[in-house]
């Protein structure tokens, strides 16, 4: 099995997957715009504390927490409470198979 190195990458394969390591200092707000994906996404908290909103529900994440957003769920990082490190991973694309952050009203679901 190959080892894939690097903190942020995409896999050049038909099913596409992406992952990355995110680091943010305390005090940030509205880090990402409300968006959705044509895949599921997992956010694994490593250190710090932050708030995310998914489908209009606010969550405070701390080390060891995992937030799962399903394909089409609108979500965003709303506040970095403490210096934060998290790992995110996206599954294979489904539906229209579009990559990146998709915005309701701009990118039809």
Each language-model region and where it sits:
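A short glycine-rich, His/Asp/Glu-containing loop-to-beta-strand
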Residues: 1-34, 39-40, 89-91
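Short, conserved beta-strand element in jelly-roll/cupin
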Residues: 36-52
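Short acidic-glycine-tyrosine-enriched beta hairpin
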Residues: 56-72
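Ligand-binding loop in jelly-roll beta-barrel domains
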Residues: 71-97
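Acidic/histidine-enriched, glycine/proline-rich intrinsically disordered or flexible terminal extensions
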Residues: 96-109
